[in-house]
């Protein structure tokens, strides 16, 4: 028989840097999950990512206090800033442009995010990522 789900925990944790300090410790502690077990498993699974890259994770906690977790792809905003070589986006994106990004780089990001996005096709996902870029003050050029 399948285990009964107690709840879900959604977090963004830096790749290879999960530790018991906030926000990981308190979120898992509330559900009674073994924090160190999660940290070791998460760090092992995110070795392939660049250290410090924010990785969204959905943790499924069961009533017997066991858990499973699923990692997602990094946020589009992080990937866009990395591709543009910037630290942060614009505070006023419609008036202040902070950089430019090539459409080919946006397409690559859309392909990376394809597993997590619910777009109909790669073109729709690319347009969605372009919108994110514009809302951050980036100019998308051909």
Swiss-Prot record:
PTM per Swiss-Prot/TrEMBL: One or more lysine residues are methylated.
GO cellular component: cytosolic large ribosomal subunit
S-S bridge residues: none
Tagged with keyword rRNA-binding: yes
Keywords: Methylation, Ribonucleoprotein, Ribosomal protein, RNA-binding, rRNA-binding
Summary of the function given for this chain in its UniProt record: Forms part of the ribosomal stalk which helps the ribosome interact with GTP-bound translation factors.
Coiled coil spans: none
Gene Ontology terms describing biological process: translation
Species for this entry: Shewanella loihica (strain ATCC BAA-1088 / PV-4)
Similarity-based family: Belongs to the universal ribosomal protein uL11 family.
A Gene Ontology molecular function term of the record: large ribosomal subunit rRNA binding
Domain of life the protein comes from: Bacteria
Taxonomic classification: Bacteria, Pseudomonadati, Pseudomonadota, Gammaproteobacteria, Alteromonadales
Entries under Pfam families matching the protein: Ribosomal_L11, Ribosomal_L11_N
Keyword Lipid metabolism appears in the UniProt entry: no
Known partners and oligomeric status: Part of the ribosomal stalk of the 50S ribosomal subunit. Interacts with L10 and the large rRNA to form the base of the stalk. L10 forms an elongated spine to which L12 dimers bind in a sequential fashion forming a multimeric L10(L12)X complex.
Gene3D superfamilies, alphabetized: Ribosomal protein L11, C-terminal domain, Ribosomal protein L11/L12, N-terminal domain
Protein name: Large ribosomal subunit protein uL11
